[in-house]
Each structure stands twice: as C-alpha cells, then as structure tokens.
Amino acid sequence: QEGIFQTIYPPALESLAKKYRPNSADITGASVEELEKELMKGNPSIVWVTAYCRNPEMGYWYEGTPDQLWVAKNLHVTTLTGFDEDYYYLTDPGIGKLKIKKSQFKYVYDTIGKKAVVVR
C-alpha cells in the first residue's frame, strides 16, 4: 500500500449537487452515449476517470474498509463538458481544459466503473 486513497463517490456528490442544481442525478452505469445525450441537452457530467485520462493503475485498497476495494490508484474526478466526432472535452480546476480521444476516455471511464453525476 502506498500513499493515501481519497475520493468522493457519486451518491455523496449527488446530494451536494442537488443543493445547487436540484435535478442533478447519480447516473452511474451510464454509457458514453448517454453522457453525450446529456451534453446535447446542455448538461455536463462529473465523471470518475484518471488524471489526464491515462490508463488506470488498478489495485486493492484495504485500510478503513470492511472489504477490499478494487480501485484505480490514479483515480481522478473531473467534468465532462463537450464532445465532437473524435474527442471528449474535460474541464478540470486543477489541470485545465483537456481534449481526450474518445476511445481512450471510454476505456478509462468503463474500467473505473462508469461512475458519473449529471449536473442538470
């Protein structure tokens, strides 16, 4: 075990998002096509991927949990704000704006577990 694993999961973030945008929802399990449909309606999604959408470094986490968790050591939560034919666009307060190939985003998003909260 190296370092500290910290994150927020979709149910907790959904509760917070609803305080500001009442129609926000935990859409964990949504496909990338469903995320695109939300974007076409003007709704960004907060997504669980990795920093810069690099390949996930998966491993087990034990401390502080009753069971072992299978998580990405390089997990990162960011906002999906747009797409075109070839790319997804992410906006991250710590990293800035990113343009990620659709195939790479889908691979990372799917591997992490398709976790997302749509902001409506």
Regions found by a protein language model. Give the residues of each.
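Cysteine-nucleophile protease catalytic domains, especially the papain-like/related folds used
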Residues: 1-44, 117-120
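Structural motif
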Residues: 44, 46-48, 77-78
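Beta-hairpin (beta-strand-turn-beta-strand) motif
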Residues: 29, 50-52
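Noncatalytic regulatory segments and standalone regulatory/sensor domains
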Residues: 40, 53-72, 79-120
